[in-house]
Amino acid sequence: MSNSRQHQGHFARKRFGQNFLVDHGVIDSIVTTIGPARGQRMVEIGPGLGALTEPLIARLATPESPLHAVELDRDLIGRLQQRFGPLLELHAGDALAFDFRSLAAPGDKPSLRIVGNLPYNISSPLLFHLMTFADAVIDQHFMLQNEVVERMVAEPGTKAFSRLSVMLQYRYVMEKMLDVPPESFQPPPKVDSAIVRMIPYEPHELPDVDPVLLGEVVTAAFSQRRKMLRNTLGDYRETIDFDGLGFDLARRAEDVSVAEYVGVAQALAAVRR
C-alpha cells in the first residue's frame, strides 16, 4: 500500500485528520455490522471520498429519504454532491458544532443512526458532543483509533479505564466490533483502528444524575490518576459523607465503578440543592 496522501485525485489533509478507507473487504464488513435498511434515518460523519457512503446509500437511501452526511472539507462536498445527487443530503460544517437533533424525526422516539470514520484528532471531543443528542439516537457505529475504543469499553481495575470510559459507559452500551489494520487506509495511519457500536440507554434505564456533576467528579478523580482518591477528591470530603456511601477513598480513580461515581455525583447534587 502506498504512503501517498493522494487518493482518487484528492490530497488527504492532515488538519482534517483524513485517512481514506480503501479496503473493500473491510468496507463490506463494516456495512454488514451497521446493517442499514431502506428508509432508516442515518447520518454519516466525515464521508470523505464515499467509501462507506456508496454501500450505505445502496442499502437505505431514496430521494425521499436520503442518507445525511456532515462534511467539513468543501473540496469533497462538491465531489460527493455530483456523485450521489439527491440520494445524499450534505451538511457543510464542523461535526463538533453540528446540531444532530435537527435531523431527528419529530417526536420523542429515538430515530437517528449515526456512523462514521471519525477524525482521530477530534474523536474524544466529538464523542462528548454526540452525547448531548443521545436521546434522539438509536445507535452509533464509529471507526476510531483502537486505543480510544479500548478505553471506551474498558472495565474498572484496568489501565485503560479512564474518564472517557466512565462518561460514555454511563450513557451507552458499547461493544468493540471489528479490528481494522492501518493498510486498510490511504494514507495508512500510524495506529491500529477499530469499529465500536454504541447504543444509548433508554430514559428509564439511566440513573437520575446530573451529567455535568458526574463529569465534574470524574474529571477531578482522574486529574492525577496515580494518586489516591483521598487526594484527588479531597475537596469534596467536607460536603460528601464518603463513609456513608460506602465509598473507599483509599483507591485510585481506575478502580471505581461507573455506579459508584454516579453515587458520588448524586450525593453532591443533594448537598448543593
Curated annotation (Swiss-Prot):
<feature type="binding site">
    <location>
        <position position="19"/>
    </location>
    <ligand>
        <name>S-adenosyl-L-methionine</name>
    </ligand>
</feature>
<keyword id="KW-0963">Cytoplasm</keyword>
<comment type="similarity">
    <text>Belongs to the class I-like SAM-binding methyltransferase superfamily. rRNA adenine N(6)-methyltransferase family. RsmA subfamily.</text>
</comment>
<feature type="binding site">
    <location>
        <position position="94"/>
    </location>
    <ligand>
        <name>S-adenosyl-L-methionine</name>
    </ligand>
</feature>
<keyword id="KW-0949">S-adenosyl-L-methionine</keyword>
<dbReference type="InterPro" id="IPR029063">
    <property type="entry name" value="SAM-dependent_MTases_sf"/>
</dbReference>
<dbReference type="GO" id="GO:0005829">
    <property type="term" value="C:cytosol"/>
</dbReference>
<keyword id="KW-0694">RNA-binding</keyword>
<feature type="binding site">
    <location>
        <position position="21"/>
    </location>
    <ligand>
        <name>S-adenosyl-L-methionine</name>
    </ligand>
</feature>
<feature type="binding site">
    <location>
        <position position="46"/>
    </location>
    <ligand>
        <name>S-adenosyl-L-methionine</name>
    </ligand>
</feature>
<keyword id="KW-0808">Transferase</keyword>
<dbReference type="GO" id="GO:0003723">
    <property type="term" value="F:RNA binding"/>
</dbReference>
<dbReference type="InterPro" id="IPR023165">
    <property type="entry name" value="rRNA_Ade_diMease-like_C"/>
</dbReference>
<dbReference type="InterPro" id="IPR020598">
    <property type="entry name" value="rRNA_Ade_methylase_Trfase_N"/>
</dbReference>
<comment type="function">
    <text>Specifically dimethylates two adjacent adenosines (A1518 and A1519) in the loop of a conserved hairpin near the 3'-end of 16S rRNA in the 30S particle. May play a critical role in biogenesis of 30S subunits.</text>
</comment>
<dbReference type="Pfam" id="PF00398">
    <property type="entry name" value="RrnaAD"/>
</dbReference>
<dbReference type="GO" id="GO:0052908">
    <property type="term" value="F:16S rRNA (adenine(1518)-N(6)/adenine(1519)-N(6))-dimethyltransferase activity"/>
</dbReference>
<keyword id="KW-0489">Methyltransferase</keyword>
<dbReference type="InterPro" id="IPR011530">
    <property type="entry name" value="rRNA_adenine_dimethylase"/>
</dbReference>
<feature type="binding site">
    <location>
        <position position="117"/>
    </location>
    <ligand>
        <name>S-adenosyl-L-methionine</name>
    </ligand>
</feature>
<keyword id="KW-0698">rRNA processing</keyword>
<dbReference type="InterPro" id="IPR001737">
    <property type="entry name" value="KsgA/Erm"/>
</dbReference>
<feature type="binding site">
    <location>
        <position position="71"/>
    </location>
    <ligand>
        <name>S-adenosyl-L-methionine</name>
    </ligand>
</feature>
<protein>
    <recommendedName>
        <fullName>Ribosomal RNA small subunit methyltransferase A</fullName>
        <ecNumber>2.1.1.182</ecNumber>
    </recommendedName>
</protein>
